[in-house]
Swiss-Prot record:
GO BP: maturation of 5.8S rRNA from tricistronic rRNA transcript (SSU-rRNA, 5.8S rRNA, LSU-rRNA); maturation of LSU-rRNA from tricistronic rRNA transcript (SSU-rRNA, 5.8S rRNA, LSU-rRNA)
Protein name: Pescadillo homolog
Coiled coil: 261-305, 520-587
Nucleus keyword on record: yes
Naturally occurring in which organism (per UniProt): Monosiga brevicollis (Choanoflagellate)
Skewed-composition ranges (Basic and acidic residues): 528-553, 576-589
């Protein structure tokens, strides 16, 4: 007879640990424990059966025992204890009213660095890119906050600097893909290292900082995200051969928002020294360019390399391709890949050789970013402390004037006056849309989300169809083929039967009998019905061969598909009713 096992020595009870027990084991306060878990990426877990853990079903927070044991070896534990000692000494000196001692203690404040945690949580650079969405959302949010008692000015300035550096990379790499204006903010989506990165940037309005938000927790996330984005920006700049941190004086023409008023004054005073430094940096970059390209992975080369190296890589791929393999497998050839790359490159240069001028009322911080990301040139008037753009409003090269007002006092010939939505719709359509529907004072078409992909059974608004047709320069009526213009189909069975009858009569069967045109539609309908019946019979036979589990799953899929179709029909009918009501109101007027 084996030894009787005691309760709590094996199974679920040994895999989970309550939060209070974990705090006692680590000898930390609850605030420090929460901060450590956020920095290390450890989150609470829900046991499958709470009663087996502690014998109670009360609401408690549990963690994996292995995660808590992992925290025992974290160097930040000692740093937190030093901070606790520092706070106690500082409080004691302030109570004794010793300003000299307080100043000396503040100079020796322990610094918490999370550099090692970034490498620990993201072993590869692609892992960091995948987890960049929340990081960018947090930093763009804090970059719009004003200075308060909780939010320090130095923290806000650092967020703005890192966000501007990231936007400058997106502009240089032509990585922006989609933009959407919502009531929450502006959604951006970029493709970096083959990974899709989506973030939201708030509108630059007066921000009212809420009081019911725990900024201590958000500050802990912000501390980690600041370090993460700093490392990511450094690596991204290295892939393009750019100097980091960027020389904002030289990049003013591409990202003027990244340079503050103080930097602009310093740039005017030290123009010669900056030019010499930039020349030295460029020379060093040219010398190390070949070595850096060899160290980069193939994915980085495909994104950052010039077009001539892309052409060489495609030619190499074509030479290495095996015709036998290509014939047996549906493998894209080098020419197909080259065409796809050329199409993608053209989509990122839709504003190439176009000159834009922004009026004062439009959101320059967003329009400048998206226009430059797609190869356009942009300028603006001087406003408050901001300096004017590279060219004036009367420049003859200007092709598009972005205005968000009913009318303008002065107009220039040879340029289009459009509203800001035209820029964003062109980006999402990947083509230059007609400007007739975006003129001054015009009722704008709906700004549809580019993140919604309609399926075969989903409802597609007429505006979406018109937008897709305009992007492809194809009229909506050309997408459907009239049945009367379709090529006539001849049933093989009818031809064989008539040939056999002609042979029995002794007629010449060299030529097939000409089909009467009146029976074409009927014959096509009969053939379609036969094909549909055969398809239904095949499906029923396949369902009989399914197991009960697969048949249930299949029925659920079919039911869901029918529900989508019914919902799409309801939306279509509702839209038709709304259009009829609108047309009736217009006719009455």
């Amino acid at each position: 007879m084996g030894r009787i096992k005691k309760k709590g020595e094996e199974g679920t009870a040994t895999e989970y640990m309550s939060r209070s027990r974990a705090v006692r084991k680590l000898q930390l306060s609850l605030a420090d424990f929460r901060r450590l878990c956020i920095l290390k990426g450890i989150y609470p877990r829900e046991p499958p059966n709470k009663k087996k853990v502690t014998g109670s079903t009360a609401n408690r927070t549990y963690y994996f025992v292995k995660d808590i044991n992992w925290l025992l070896h974290e160097p930040l534990l000692q740093r937190f204890r030093e901070l606790k000692t520092y706070a106690r000494r500082l409080k004691k000196a302030e109570a004794k009213d010793q300003p000299g001692v307080v100043k000396a203690i503040r100079r020796r404040e322990p610094k918490v660095k999370v550099n090692h945690l970034v490498k620990e949580r993201y072993p590869s650079f692609v892992d960091a890119i995948r987890d960049l969405d929340d990081c960018l959302c947090m930093l763009f949010l804090f970059a719009s906050f004003p200075q308060t008692g909780v939010i320090r000015a130095r923290m806000v300035e650092k967020c703005r600097r890192l966000c501007n550096e990231f936007m400058l990379y997106v502009v240089r790499a032509r990585a922006l893909r989609k933009v959407f204006l919502s009531i929450k903010g502006i959604y951006y989506q970029a493709e970096i290292m083959g990974q899709t990165v989506t973030w939201i940037a708030p509108y630059q309005f007066a921000t009212d900082v809420p009081t019911d938000v725990d900024f201590r927790v958000m500050g802990t996330f912000l501390q980690f995200y600041l370090t993460l984005l700093g490392f990511v920006n450094f690596k991204l700049y290295a892939t393009l051969g750019m100097h980091y941190p960027p020389q904002f004086e030289a990049a003013q023409s591409e990202a003027s928002e990244t340079m503050s008023k103080h930097h602009r004054k310093q740039a005017k005073k030290t123009e010669s020294r900056v030019a010499q430094a930039l020349a030295d940096v460029k020379a060093a970059m040219d010398e190390d360019l070949n070595d850096e390209e060899e160290e980069l992975d193939a994915q980085t080369k495909q994104e950052a390399a010039p077009a001539d190296r892309d052409q060489a890589s495609f030619d190499t791929f074509e030479a290495m391709a095996d015709p036998a393999v290509d014939s047996d497998m549906n493998v894209p050839s080098g020419q197909d890949l080259e065409e796809a790359a050329a199409e993608a490159d053209a989509a990122t240069r839709i504003f190439q050789n176009l000159y834009f001028f922004l009026s004062r009322e439009v959101p320059r911080y967003s329009l400048e970013f998206v226009i430059r990301s797609f190869g356009g040139n942009v300028s603006w008037d001087a406003l408050d402390e901001a300096e004017a753009g590279p060219y004036g409003v009367d420049d003859p090269r200007i092709t598009h004037h972005i205005v968000d007002r009913p009318a303008v006092s002065q107009t220039f010939d040879g340029r289009h006056y459009v509203q800001p939505q035209w820029v964003y719709d062109c980006i999402n359509a990947k083509a230059l849309l007609p400007t007739s529907t975006y003129t001054l004072g015009a009722v704008l078409p709906p700004h549809l989300s580019p993140f919604v992909e309609e399926g075969a059974d989903d409802y597609m608004p007429p505006e979406r169809r018109a937008q897709l047709a305009a992007a492809k320069n194809i009229h909506s009526t050309d997408m459907t083929i009239d049945e009367s213009e379709a090529p006539e189909e001849i049933d093989d069975e009818d031809i064989y039967r008539k040939e056999l009858e002609a042979e029995l009569r002794g007629d010449d069967t060299a030529e097939a009998p000409e089909e009467p045109k009146g029976n074409t539609a009927k014959r096509k309908k009969t053939k379609a019905e036969k094909g549909k019946a055969a398809e239904e019979e095949r499906k029923e036979m396949a369902k009989l061969m399914m197991s009960k589990r697969d048949r249930t799953l299949y029925n659920r899929i079919v039911h869901s598909k029918k529900q989508k179709q019914v919902e799409a029909q309801k939306l279509t009918a509702r839209r038709q009713q709304i259009d009829k009501e609108k047309s009736a109101k217009k006719s009455k007027k």
